[in-house]
């Protein structure tokens, strides 16, 4: 998590994710949060102004985490398809460890009335897509990834399929191993894009 946040803020984020996992985003209230942590609502307000600020902190946590994955893969000497495979597997690992992140990261419909949250999700998507696009374009130049499909379209296909796969896992009430089935799934995606 961000080095600038306090241990108490980390605890609030962690417990917020637990509440979201059990009750959905609607169940994340300052009252429920204070009760679960075991202190007053006023104590929560000392760290975060409101529920929106907590959700922003969760999205920032995810952004930092995924940004690290994407930047590390950009620096990697592996080929483009291996980089894409690692990106998928890192996302599967992150979501498996914290399933409630899916409810926040893929919740733009719920956030539609909160511009700051929509902007935060859009920022994450844009940054991740830009880095993925760089990996794809590099792979196309090296003939590792098919070049008969526009790189922007491939990025949308890859990101969209990742999202759909993770949402299916969530909608099945996490009934299968995301990392195990995800490993098989990413191999199929790689077959589709490989040159």
Describe each PLM feature range.
Residues 64-67, 71-72, 97, 115-142, ...:
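Amphipathic alpha-helical packing segments from all-alpha helical-bundle domains
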Residues 86-97, 130, 134-142, 160-161, ...:
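C-terminal peripheral helix-coil segments that are non-catalytic and often amphipathic
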Residues 57, 71-100, 151-158:
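Hydrophobic alpha-helical connector segments
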Residues 96-116:
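Amphipathic alpha-helical segments used for helix-helix packing
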Residues 29, 103-105, 114, 147-148, ...:
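Short, hydrophobic secondary-structure boundary micro-motifs
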Residues 1-7:
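N-terminal intrinsically disordered/low-complexity leader segments
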Residues 8-16, 33, 58-62, 66, ...:
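Generic hydrophobic, amphipathic alpha-helix propensity
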Residues 11, 19-53, 57:
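Helix-turn-helix
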């Amino acid at each position: 998590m961000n080095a600038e946040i306090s241990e108490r803020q980390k605890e609030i984020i962690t417990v917020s994710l637990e509440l979201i996992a059990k009750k959905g985003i609607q169940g994340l209230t300052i009252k429920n949060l204070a009760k679960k942590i075991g202190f007053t609502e006023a104590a929560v307000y000392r760290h975060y102004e409101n529920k929106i600020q907590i959700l922003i902190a969760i999205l920032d946590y995810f952004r930092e985490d995924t940004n690290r994955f994407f930047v590390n893969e950009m620096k990697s000497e592996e080929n483009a398809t291996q980089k894409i495979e690692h990106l998928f597997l890192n996302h599967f690992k992150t979501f498996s460890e914290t399933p409630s992140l899916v409810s926040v990261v893929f919740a733009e419909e719920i956030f539609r009335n909160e511009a700051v949250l929509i902007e935060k999700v859009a920022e994450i998507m844009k940054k991740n897509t830009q880095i993925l696009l760089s990996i794809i374009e590099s792979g196309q130049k090296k003939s590792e990834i098919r070049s008969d499909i526009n790189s922007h379209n491939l990025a949308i296909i890859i990101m969209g399929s990742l999202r759909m796969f993770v949402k299916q896992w969530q909608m099945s009430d996490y009934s299968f191993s995301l990392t195990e089935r995800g490993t098989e799934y990413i191999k199929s995606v790689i077959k589709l894009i490989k040159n």
